[in-house]
């Protein structure tokens, strides 16, 4: 994956409002080699972002490389405004810090282990990191919507929030894990990313199409609802 220094810095909502470079989205990527998850404000990421998210790598959670062929978009979260998208990104990063640093021991106790006491893995892949990321996404979204100001809650939104998933299995049981009053009131939609193949070259095109879809919701695209 090509290093892009222009996306290495954290960008506030005011910057997105000014540039309109992408719609209010948060991108979540998973590593096909080790199973780790990376959060980004853009449909790409740099070494700086990897370094910030993986501050204490170890044998069970190695710092992943930027090789383009080992990263896949797990989901894209579409919010109603840039303030929400920035808050969601910040919440996800804070929860990652709690899991890996501030509350590392408590978090590690909840992870499935093998007979040697290591985080369970198959080959080198550890599925627990993706599962934790989905749980953190749900909790972060709840905080974003529940902490909205009274004025924001009374304002009729221009569009519904939505999540485009890599596959239905990745989001888990929709009725069990995503059935919350705040989600239902906002009409949170779960959709699937339509793929022809499974290659990194195609993925960049898909992410561009999702951005175009959210910028121009009336246009026809090849994204299917679940």
From Swiss-Prot:
The keyword Iron does not apply. InterPro entries: Ribosomal_mL67. GO terms for biological process: cellular response to oxidative stress; DNA recombination; mitochondrial genome maintenance; mitochondrial translation; positive regulation of mitochondrial DNA replication; regulation of DNA-templated transcription. Keywords: Mitochondrion, Nucleus, Ribonucleoprotein, Ribosomal protein, Transcription, Transcription regulation. Disulfide bonds: none annotated. Coiled coil: none annotated. It is found in: Nucleus; Mitochondrion. Pfam families: Mhr1 (PF12829). GO terms for molecular function: DNA binding; DNA strand exchange activity; single-stranded DNA binding; structural constituent of ribosome. The keyword Mitochondrion applies. GO terms for cellular component: mitochondrial inner membrane; mitochondrial large ribosomal subunit; mitochondrion; nucleus. Signal peptide: none annotated. Component of the mitochondrial large ribosomal subunit (mt-LSU). Mature yeast 74S mitochondrial ribosomes consist of a small (37S) and a large (54S) subunit. The 37S small subunit contains a 15S ribosomal RNA (15S mt-rRNA) and 34 different proteins. The 54S large subunit contains a 21S rRNA (21S mt-rRNA) and 46 different proteins. Present with 2610 molecules/cell in log phase SD medium. Belongs to the mitochondrion-specific ribosomal protein mL67 family. Component of the mitochondrial ribosome (mitoribosome), a dedicated translation machinery responsible for the synthesis of mitochondrial genome-encoded proteins, including at least some of the essential transmembrane subunits of the mitochondrial respiratory chain. The mitoribosomes are attached to the mitochondrial inner membrane and translation products are cotranslationally integrated into the membrane. mL67/MHR1 also has extraribosomal functions, being involved in regulation of mitochondrial DNA recombination, maintenance and repair, and generation of homoplasmic cells. This is Large ribosomal subunit protein mL67. It comes from Saccharomyces cerevisiae (strain ATCC 204508 / S288c). The gene is MHR1.
């Amino acid at each position: 994956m090509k290093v892009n220094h222009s996306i290495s810095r954290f960008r506030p909502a005011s910057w997105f409002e000014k540039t309109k470079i992408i719609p209010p989205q948060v991108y979540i990527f998973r590593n096909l080699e080790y199973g780790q998850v990376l959060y980004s404000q853009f449909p790409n990421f740099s070494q700086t972002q990897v370094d910030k998210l993986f501050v204490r790598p170890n044998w069970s959670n190695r710092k992943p490389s930027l090789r383009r062929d080992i990263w896949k978009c797990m989901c894209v979260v579409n919010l109603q405004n840039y303030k929400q998208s920035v808050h969601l990104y910040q919440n996800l990063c804070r929860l990652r810090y709690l899991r890996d640093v501030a509350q590392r021991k408590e978090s590690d106790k909840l992870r499935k282990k093998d007979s040697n006491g290591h985080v369970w893995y198959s080959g080198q892949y550890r599925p627990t990191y993706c599962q934790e990321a989905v749980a953190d996404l749900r909790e972060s979204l709840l905080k974003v919507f529940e902490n909205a100001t009274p004025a924001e809650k009374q304002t009729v939104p221009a569009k519904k929030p939505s999540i485009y998933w890599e596959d239905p299995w990745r989001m888990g049981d929709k009725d069990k894990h995503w059935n919350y009053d705040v989600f239902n009131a906002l009409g949170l939609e779960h959709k699937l990313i339509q793929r022809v193949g499974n290659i990194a070259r195609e993925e960049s095109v898909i992410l561009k199409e999702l951005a175009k879809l959210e910028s121009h919701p009336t246009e026809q695209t090849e994204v299917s609802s679940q």
